[in-house]
């Protein structure tokens, strides 16, 4: 477990293997910062190949028993886990906020959306039901089973340190697999605590292992034949690498990358509602969400002029503060590199000729000059060819791309290299229906700015936002974490004929 010293001492974190906190042995460490101050608050060990292989060995041994538990018994562990998390939800939210930088209220949402998938996975006795065909041929029955893969792994990002680990771990465990989690080294304390709570809930030691690390850790998980499937969420270049490497080693993979989510604002939209949606979806969590709205597409010049004027006014009243400030709309970014990246993109937008309506580059929170803060920025008259439209910024920057008509607005997200999510704000049902059917993205919101599906539906983007044919949570999660076995059977009374040398048919 984390060893606590006095406040001036950096905490030493550990791996979690075999139900125990395991110190790192590689000699390599990463720093965990307080985004509010920029100070190092903890050190996290980075596993080498030997440490990662030890975690796989432990998981493989533990899975054999866990996979034999009946689904109801596994579901009870998930239900007890839910109760334990509820008992310390506020402490978890504050811990998450202290390492990531999102507000405590936003951290509560991070945890809640993860727990909803745990609730979904607790229905595993129903979700694992197979198919049955009685008398498919004379005296022959056919049925299918969904069986665990064995050892599976998840590589999760810094921006949702509770939600995405739970999105991956809960269905994987419910299906009878052992799960190895490699969380982000930026904010690893909440994943470690969740692993402790799973153990307290009755999960056998070794069924859930947490290993921190970098590329060597990831490559070990990808190359070891004992790991049968792997999920990833992060940047598109790494998602593509993980997917290709997993496929080359015969593994099932679901990999989710970057996004550039557009929100279409039709002339008939409720403009106040649209502005509220854009402010929250564009600047909430300092824009560090894969489902953040980063491009507003007003249709028509009058709509655009009115929208930009209202956005400018609203941005001026945003409160940026410490992550533990209950009055803050958003807090710091997760790292100094993130602040530098956001500033470079704002500089680039100016160079490309976009109109910088609100400039957040020079924002400093008094008394927190070394914190990882960036102010809200707003660009108008961005064109599709500009890099600030083509590339993911992942920060508090909203771009306005004006569309002359509906068809032009529809083309913008449809032709973009990313295809994660999109939203349309309109009062017209025909327009909304046409948009949802024709737009080329994986998730669509109608008057909903962040269309993250509920737990019993699947989450996933298209094009360069997602690699693999099965998405996260919902029915796809059960398919991803199991293999289908089909059994064809008949009994002695039907076995009296002699040898047959032709392919059997069900006559």
Segments and roles (model prediction):
Residues 41-47, 62-68, 154, 263-266, ...:
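Short, well-ordered beta-strand elements within core beta-sheets of diverse protein domains
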Residues 1-36, 361:
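Hydrophobic face of amphipathic alpha-helices that form TPR/SEL1-like repeat modules
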Residues 39-128, 139:
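Glycine-rich loop-to-alpha-helix module at the N-terminal edge of alpha/beta enzyme cores
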Residues 130-276, 403, 468:
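Rossmann-like NAD(P) dinucleotide-binding subdomain of oxidoreductase/dehydrogenase enzymes
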Residues 237-383, 412, 446, 493-497, ...:
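ALDH superfamily catalytic-core signature
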Residues 37-43, 227, 264, 312-319, ...:
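Conserved C-terminal structural/oligomerization subdomain of aldehyde/semialdehyde dehydrogenase
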Residues 63, 67, 82-89, 93, ...:
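Structural signal for hydrophobic packing residues in well-ordered secondary-structure cores
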Residues 38, 74, 96, 118, ...:
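Residue-level signal for inorganic ion chemistry
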């Amino acid at each position: 477990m984390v060893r606590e010293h006095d406040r001036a001492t950096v905490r030493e974190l550990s791996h979690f293997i075999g139900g125990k906190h395991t110190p790192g042995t590689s000699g390599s460490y990463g720093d965990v910062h307080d985004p509010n101050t920029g100070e190092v608050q903890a050190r996290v060990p980075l596993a080498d190949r030997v440490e990662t292989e030890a975690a796989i060995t432990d998981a493989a041994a533990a899975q054999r028993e866990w996979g034999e538990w009946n689904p109801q018994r596994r579901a009870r562990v998930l239900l007890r886990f839910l109760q334990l998390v509820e008992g310390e939800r506020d402490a978890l939210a504050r811990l998450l906020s202290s390492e990531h930088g999102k507000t405590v209220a936003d951290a509560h949402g991070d945890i809640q959306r993860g727990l909803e998938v745990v609730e979904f996975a607790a229905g595993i006795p129903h979700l694992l039901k197979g198919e049955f065909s009685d008398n498919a041929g004379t005296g022959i029955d056919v049925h299918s089973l969904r069986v665990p893969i064995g050892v599976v792994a998840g590589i999760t990002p810094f921006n949702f340190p509770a939600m995405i680990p739970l999105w991956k771990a809960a269905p994987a465990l419910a299906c009878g697999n052992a799960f190895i989690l490699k969380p982000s080294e930026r904010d690893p304390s909440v994943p470690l605590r969740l692993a402790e709570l799973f153990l307290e809930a009755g999960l056998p030691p070794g069924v859930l292992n947490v290993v921190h690390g970098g590329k060597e850790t990831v490559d070990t998980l990808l190359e070891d034949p004992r790991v049968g499937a792997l999920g990833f969420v992060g940047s598109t270049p790494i998602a593509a690498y993980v997917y290709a490497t997993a496929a080359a080693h015969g593994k099932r993979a679901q990999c989710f990358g970057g996004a550039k989510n557009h929100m279409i604002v039709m002339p008939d939209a409720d403009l106040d509602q649209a502005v509220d949606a854009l402010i929250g979806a564009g600047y909430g969590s300092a824009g560090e969400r894969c489902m953040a709205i980063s491009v507003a597409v007003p249709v028509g010049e009058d709509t655009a002029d009115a929208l930009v004027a209202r956005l400018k006014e609203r941005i001026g009243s945003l409160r940026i503060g410490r992550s533990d400030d209950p009055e803050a709309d958003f807090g710091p970014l997760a790292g100094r590199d993130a602040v530098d990246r956001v500033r470079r993109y704002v500089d680039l937008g100016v160079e490309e000729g976009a109109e910088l309506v609100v400039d957040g580059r020079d924002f400093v929170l008094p008394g927190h000059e070394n914190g990882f803060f960036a102010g809200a920025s707003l660009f108008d008259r961005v064109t599709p060819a500009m890099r600030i439209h083509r590339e993911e910024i992942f920060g508090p920057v909203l771009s306005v791309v004006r569309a002359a008509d509906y068809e032009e607005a529809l083309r913008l997200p449809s032709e973009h290299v990313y295809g994660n999510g999109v939203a349309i704000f309109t009062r017209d049902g025909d327009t909304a229906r046409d948009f949802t059917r024709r737009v080329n993205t994986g998730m669509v919101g109608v008057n909903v700015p962040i269309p993250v599906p509920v737990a019993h539906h699947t989450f996933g983007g298209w094009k360069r936002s997602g690699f693999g044919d099965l998405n996260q949570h919902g029915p796809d999660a059960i398919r991803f974490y199991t293999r289908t076995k089909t059994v064809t059977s008949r009994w002695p009374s039907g076995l009296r004929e002699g040898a047959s040398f032709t392919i059997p048919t069900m006559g």
